[in-house]
Design a protein with these regions (language model features):
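Small-residue hinge/turn detector
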Residues: 69-81
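Glycosyltransferase-associated regions of secretory-pathway enzymes
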Residues: 1-68, 84-170
């Protein structure tokens, strides 16, 4: 079962744009029974260093976007819950989406020309320890070792995520 925890990240709380603060408030308002956790870049690195030490060499050499991608997989793997990008406005309670599920990923319909991006990794939920999350983190690390010529969307982002979910479905 997916725990009622919402995870979001941004550089730091002070630099959060006003429009994103409205999004954060909408998430909290629609989900009052959920624990809300905000992580700064500094806190993200600290968690990776403390709880996922084997990822630190790759994490430290990643771009900020790649670090954010890797962190979201790791934090939900560790604690379970809902990950949501900070620029997402929430209009309903998450309970309707996650019910008794162990893993939920958004699916963007109507993007045939962008089928590589079919599954969203800007919004997903899982129980702690779900295998898709540690596999995503391991792929981020392995893909990063291929070097800077690999496109971020394929290395750590929605293309990698979509490939992984498709593989695990079959």
């Amino acid at each position: 079962m997916i725990p009622r925890i919402i995870h979001q990240t941004w550089r730091n709380e002070k630099s959060t744009p006003a429009s994103y603060k409205l999004c954060i408030e909408s998430v909290k308002k629609q989900n009052p029974s959920y624990s809300y956790r905000f992580y700064s870049d500094e806190e993200c690195r600290s968690i990776v260093k403390e709880d996922f030490r084997e990822f630190i060499p790759a994490y430290d050499s990643m771009s900020p976007v790649e670090k954010a991608d890797l962190f979201r997989y790791l934090i939900v793997y560790r604690d379970g819950g809902v990950y949501l990008d900070i620029d997402c406005y929430c209009v309903a309670n998450f309970d309707r989406l996650i019910c008794d599920a162990e893993f939920v990923a958004g699916y963007e319909q109507g993007w045939k020309e962008r089928a590589l991006f079919r599954y969203t990794q800007w919004a997903f939920a899982a129980r702690a320890g779900h295998p898709v999350l540690i596999e995503a983190a391991n792929r981020c690390k392995a893909n990063h070792l291929q070097g800077p010529t690999t496109w971020t969307l394929k290395k750590t982002g929605p293309i990698m995520w979509t490939y992984l979910i498709n593989e695990m479905e079959n």
